Amino acid sequence: MEKRSFLVILLFMVLNLAGISQSKSFYDFKVKTLEGEDFDLASLKGKKVMVVNTASKCGFTPQYKDLEALYEQYKDVLVIIGFPANNFLHQEPGTASEIRNFCTTNYGVTFPMMAKISVKGSDMHPLYKWLTSKKENGVKDSSVKWNFQKYLIDENGKLVNVVYSSEKPNSDKILSWITSK
């Protein structure tokens, strides 16, 4: 009887741990566009995705130009998603319409831009909690250091790498990732 109870408890523990260790996928999230529409990340299955926290008044803001060029060149295999955030020195103070106008007028941005969110702190958006926590993404812990940090997601919705702001969108590292099979 004791042996049977032990086996039942052991089986319960194993099944419970298996459930805990399963990571969510990038595709499990839904976000809002700058226009307030729902955007289901599952619609991006089969493509690589670069998630970038953006800001209009940052030294890295000119990266919008390279991000747009990359998006235009590789849009068959890559989607870039911008998430405006005001977490660093209040460098994204604009409203949704101001952000859209800024991105379109100054950089011709056509890649998807999402609603302004928080990428750190107690009000961090759930997607960024997933991106920054190994416990959630199953790959690595990171923290968002500054605007224009890039999270690379593979075609299966798994986090692959984090690329910091100083790395340009068209760097060899990023281009190699995009073109790899």
Short names for language-model regions:
Residues 20-42, 125-126:
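N-terminal "domain-start" segment that seeds a small globular fold
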Residues 47-48, 57, 61-85, 104-107:
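Conserved helix-turn-beta segment immediately C-terminal to the redox Cys motif
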Residues 1-24:
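Bacterial Sec-dependent N-terminal signal peptides
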Residues 25-26, 97-146:
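Short, internal strand/loop/helix patches
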Residues 129, 134-181:
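Thiol-/selenol-based redox modules, centered on thioredoxin-like
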Residues 77-94, 109-121:
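Thiol-based oxidoreductase modules, predominantly thioredoxin-like and allied folds used
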Residues 33, 53-57:
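Amphipathic alpha-helical repeat scaffolds
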